[in-house]
Amino acid sequence: METVESMRSEGFDIGLRKTIPEAAYLPVAEQTVTREGIPVLANRFAAEAVMQGAHLYSPGVKNCQGLRSGMKATVQDQNGVLVGSGIARQGETAILNYHQGIAVEILSSRFRLPPLRESRWYESGLIHLQSLPSMVACHVLDPMPEDVIVDLNCSPAGKMSYLCQLSDNRARVVGFDRNTRKTEKAREHLERLHCKNYQLIAHDSRYAHLDYTLRADKVLVDPSCTGLGVTPRLSVDTTMADVENLAAYQKQFMRAATALVKKGGTIVYSVCTITGEECEGVVRFAESELGLIETDARPIVGSGCLDSKALSQRFDPELDGAGYFIARFIKP
């Protein structure tokens, strides 16, 4: 609460969620971006970040012909949608050759949000930017002191750090990611938030149950998905083959989680998407093929499921601002 009051005292209109006491939010205003200066083409991911107020970093730039440091610039995506404007902090040669640092300092964006990642509250580990559904998924897992918790898909460690926080840093939290660079980034994040009693393992967690003797009280499965619930989006290029392949991929993590968790232990499956093949399809697989028992995914914060009798929880992008799915299982 002290952090919230500090931010409010400096003009931030901070609100608090009643259902999740650690969740604070800022109202978002949409505005029109006008074209001025040199056009800068950004990839979709960078453009979506700029659209929400982030600065444009050099790795996200695809083209910036004629740009010099100090020039006005307008950032657009590959379809010509204007997402933000500001001042170039590097020239074309430096941006495209070195791929480091801020390319365009954004002064106006489509959605007006302050650059919180550059604030002193963020740098000192007092705040972290995370979606409400992601926080709910951690509450559904219900981490307790002395638990052994495995996060099979930990990068970038947003949920992992929150699990540490919810257990007062007393649970042993083990995070897996197959990419060593990502685990190092996760470590930086966990250190910034002053997390303790955690372990990061660079390993393909689909095979964690075969390669490690670790046994967990609780397992979080938050695998790669089609991401169709992420908002705002500038474009969607997902195919049915993508949906089917990712659903099959997710089932591999559920199989590993089932082997890792102790009898009577908890598995939470969460994805930031809305397809039935991934969400409910993975639930059916977990019950019929893995023998898991689905239980209520509480606390209920999302607007509801496709089936009113379902035990899982859905967030609707139209009603809740983002699409998300959470299911909770017990291993008998």
Question: Where are each of the predicted segments found?
Answer:
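S-adenosylmethionine
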Residues: 1-332
